[in-house]
Regions:
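Acidic/aromatic-lined carbohydrate-recognition and catalytic surfaces
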Residues: 2-210
Length: 210
């Protein structure tokens, strides 16, 4: 057995340890500037660190921040990067540290779907998407297709009822060929848009199912 007697949970020299954290739920109604305005009060309470809810760009209207759309941006409805920097400056002014939750393993399927650019690319290009490695996809299970369980029955029934519609009015540009299903938007693999609808749905990098 390894000798663990030398191990310790104490921090190394110069490391700051949170002693008392205060969690702040960031959203459009309580942004980074709102949090900054409370820095002095929280410091007076004896708080040592502000603990922020997820700070990355979530779906519009999110109140919790775990429904991430863009891992490269700070929550814009809460003030964006500039307001975030003001919060950090205010915290430092009052001797507070800042702990951020970045939830790198969280994403969401928004409406419209194209707001999540990595997911949109994955659905359009499948295994060839530059974002394919971002996702835990078992490509062998669905014959290189991504399962999207959004239907109330079979895809054949949905097509026959007219629940799945092809239109050139979606995607980031608003002019891409997409499949619509009751408000859910799915990209169409380039070059398949002229196929008959029953063939087109089977030619995509995803499989719509119940």
């Amino acid at each position: 057995m390894a000798d663990v007697t030398h191990l310790t949970h104490r921090p190394g020299p110069g490391r700051v340890v949170p002693v008392s954290t205060y969690r702040l739920q960031i959203h459009a109604g309580f942004g980074y500037d709102d949090a900054a305005a409370r820095a002095a009060y929280l410091a007076d309470l004896g708080v040592t660190h502000l603990y922020l809810s997820p700070v990355l760009q979530p779906a519009p209207g999110s109140t919790h921040g775990y429904d991430v759309l863009d891992h490269t941006r700070i929550h814009e409805e809460a003030g964006g990067r500039e307001a975030f920097d003001r919060l950090v400056a205010a915290a430092r002014k009052h001797g507070l540290g800042v702990i951020v939750d970045v939830v790198p393993n969280h994403m969401t399927v928004p409406r419209p779907t194209h707001l999540n650019a990595p997911l949109w690319s994955l659905l359009r290009e499948g295994r060839e998407s530059p974002y394919a490695a971002w996702f835990d996809v078992d490509w062998d299970v669905e014959d290189d297709r991504i399962l999207m369980p959004v239907l109330g029955g079979t895809i054949g029934e949905a097509v026959e009822r007219g629940d799945v519609v092809l239109a050139q009015d979606g995607g980031p540009s608003g002019r891409e060929w997409v499949l619509w299903h009751h408000g859910d938007e799915f990209p169409v693999r380039p070059g398949t848009e002229t196929l008959p609808l029953p063939e087109l749905v089977e030619a995509q990098a995803y499989r719509l199912s119940s």
